[in-house]
Amino acid sequence: MTLLSTLRGISSPARQQPGTQSESRRGGDTLAERGLAVAGVSHGFDGTAVLESVTLAVDRGETVAIIGPSGTGKTTLLRLLALFSEPDDGTIGLDGTDVWRQSERQRLAARRRIGMVFQKANLFDTTVRRNVRYGLSVRRSWRERLRSWLGGRKRQESVFEALDIVGLADAASQSASSLSGGEAQRVAFARALAYDPDFLLLDEPTSDLDPRNTAVIEEAVDAARSRGLGVAVATHDMHQARRIADRIVVLLDGQVIEAGPTERVFSDPDDARARKFINGELVY
């Protein structure tokens, strides 16, 4: 049974214990032996530092919300977690393995285990169904594509299951160009889910959506997490972060200034700057 076929109507399992740690291969920070992680990561553009010595891990079966002011590095951190580029310093690991010390083929295999939904949905001018199926085509290895081609019915089932999760199964034959912005974002979410990734990264996924579409996305996030995906969400919406996240990471000026269980961070943060940000008192 696939992940997608069991996402709906399943209660959340007990939280997994945090992964153990091993030494990073590039620095003194530790790299989680389970899940998707960064250890001591720094990164910048054109000589300007964006992230400085960031360490965090996303384990399977949990949702981590990354919050902080605009321009503080949330999107850059997600893109590094998605393995879009190599960090200037530090380690990016998948289940304890330094991905950027692997071969290109191994990195491609690792990248296929990670789905990402951007702030703005980028859909093709074709049907909703074909947009979702595109994720299956580009993310799977040639062996997986061959098996999928030989089992076309299973491939179609994956597409419709993903669309059903976001409430758009009835729109499968509809042109993507006719969708509202919220519906397009839901299609992008379905596309990321269709190939059953281990980890899902969301960059401000509901920033421009109405309450109904926001609720659908949040329900889909919770369903994915409840069935074992590790989810990381960058959001400026404090209420959303508190609703959907198991853990909170607060970024300020490219550094993690606070991290911990959601209720503890919101009710009693250790860092004074994090407290001011959460209370809306930080002038930035």
UniProtKB/Swiss-Prot annotation:
Q: What stretch or stretches form a coiled coil here? A: none
Question: Mainly resides where?
Answer: membrane
What gene is this protein a product of? pstB2
What Pfam families does this protein's entry cite?
A: ABC_tran (PF00005)
Gene Ontology biological-process annotations: phosphate ion transmembrane transport
Q: Which PROSITE patterns match?
A: ABC_TRANSPORTER_1, ABC_TRANSPORTER_2, PSTB
The name this protein carries in UniProt is Phosphate import ATP-binding protein PstB 2
**Reaction catalysed by this chain?**
phosphate(out) + ATP + H2O = ADP + 2 phosphate(in) + H(+)
Give UniProt keywords alphabetically.
ATP-binding, Cell membrane, Membrane, Nucleotide-binding, Phosphate transport, Translocase, Transport
Q: Where is this region: Disordered?
A: 1-29
Identify the InterPro entries for this entry.
AAA+_ATPase, ABC_transporter-like_ATP-bd, ABC_transporter-like_CS, P-loop_NTPase, PstB-like
Query: How would you summarize the oligomeric state and partners of this protein?
Result: The complex is composed of two ATP-binding proteins (PstB), two transmembrane proteins (PstC and PstA) and a solute-binding protein (PstS).
Q: Which residues bind ATP?
A: 68-75
As for family, the record states: Belongs to the ABC transporter superfamily. Phosphate importer (TC 3.A.1.7) family.
Polar residues compositional bias, start-end: 1-22
Q: Residue ranges of the ABC transporter domain?
A: 36-278
* Membrane topology summary: Peripheral membrane protein
Its Gene Ontology cellular component terms are: plasma membrane
**Compartments reported by the entry:** Cell membrane
UniProt-listed CDD domains: ABC_PstB_phosphate_transporter
Instruction: Give the species.
Output: Natronomonas pharaonis (strain ATCC 35678 / DSM 2160 / CIP 103997 / JCM 8858 / NBRC 14720 / NCIMB 2260 / Gabara) (Halobacterium pharaonis)
Q: Which residues cross the membrane?
A: none
